[in-house]
Amino acid sequence: MSRIGKLPVNLPAGVTVEVLAGNVVKVKGPLGELSQKVDADITVTVEGTTGKLTRPTDQPRHRSLHGLYRALINNMVVGVSAGYTIRQELVGVGYRVDVQGQLLILSLGFSHEVQIMLPAEIKAEAEPVKKGQNPVLCLKSADKQLIGHVAAKVRSLRKPEPYKGKGIKFVGEQLRRKAGKSAGAK
């Protein structure tokens, strides 16, 4: 058995999971509704407050799909019940973030401001900047895949560089720093 796939998916209060035609799993909860098409070989059953996935054989393909879809469904359950939050810190002189509805406006040292239109499922807010601290962008959503994709897209605008650490980084992310060229000259 797959170590991940054999675990049951626990459903918190207020979360319902239903399997629709075409093997589409629909998860509803207080924070929204998500759906995921599951491979035809994987069977999804819901019994009370737990969901269970089974596979027909122990072929490597079935084993990998078993764990994959169990993890995806569990991420959907956590998303509609608790939600996901990603915080990103903008490190650099003059780096700023402004949120106007679903429009994200970033000042990242370019000659122009960068504007990103966020999907409707994602809510963004710029945390108030205290003196001496870097601006922080907070993204919230029920969809883990979508929020991760958007956060990676924002980070790719200015990846942190290894010498001074300037760029957009996730809060708590440890960057590999390098010594400058003066470190080797002795």
Where on the chain are the PLM-derived regions?
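N-terminal intrinsically disordered, cationic/polar leader segments
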Residues: S2-H66, R70-K186
